[in-house]
Amino acid sequence: VKRLAIYCGSATPSDPVYIENARFVGRTLAERGIGVVYGGGRLGLMGAVADGALEAGGEVIGVIPTALVNAEVAHRGCTELHVVETMHQRKQAFTDLSDGFVTIPGGTGTMDELWEAMSWAQLGYHSKPVGLLNVTGYYDGLIAFVDKMAEVGFLRPMHRDILLIDDQLDSLLDRMAGHKVARPIFSMSSSEL
């Protein structure tokens, strides 16, 4: 794994543990020689992930829509900053530039990114690992929901296993490195989207 897309919130949460953890994620990836691909922002968890990686000498590739650059929320310290026109182009770039995906706490945009990475793997658009870091139980409800989808038959058990879940970053990264691809429903390329 050379680079991982990190999905996370751009907001500053009320509990500083989330910012501290985001900085830790960035720093740990840099120390492992893994580049960060992320939303290109300087605020919230996004900024903390980038800062942690940059402070540890890591590669940070931001992908941000023009509208957010114009709103002056872009992180100017990125190793590379890719400016795109649409959110779809942004998410496609995350897939194209990374070898896998890690979701840490965030809001609806983060959920959109996670669901897309998971559903694209399910459909065979990519075969990259999809990880969920459950910081202080933040995603307990989401995990229960995913399990419920599998229980009632809306998610095949083999596709439930696409989502690798852990509350410790190092063990999540180790599991992602040993990732075995689930059999997709279809076999497609991302150019067929």
Q: Predicted regions: what is each one?
A:
Residues I104, Y125-K128, T136-G141:
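Glycine-rich phosphate/nucleotide-binding loop
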Residues V1-L97, V135-D170, D174, K180-L193:
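A cross-family phosphate/adenosyl-ligand binding-site feature
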Residues I104-P105, P129-L133, R160-L163:
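Flexible, glycine/proline-enriched loop segments at strand-loop-helix junctions
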Residues Q89-G124, G131, A182-S189:
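Active-site/ligand-binding-proximal alpha/beta "capping" segment
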Residues T110, W120-H126, K148-E151, L155, ...:
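Alpha-helix capping at helix-to-loop junctions
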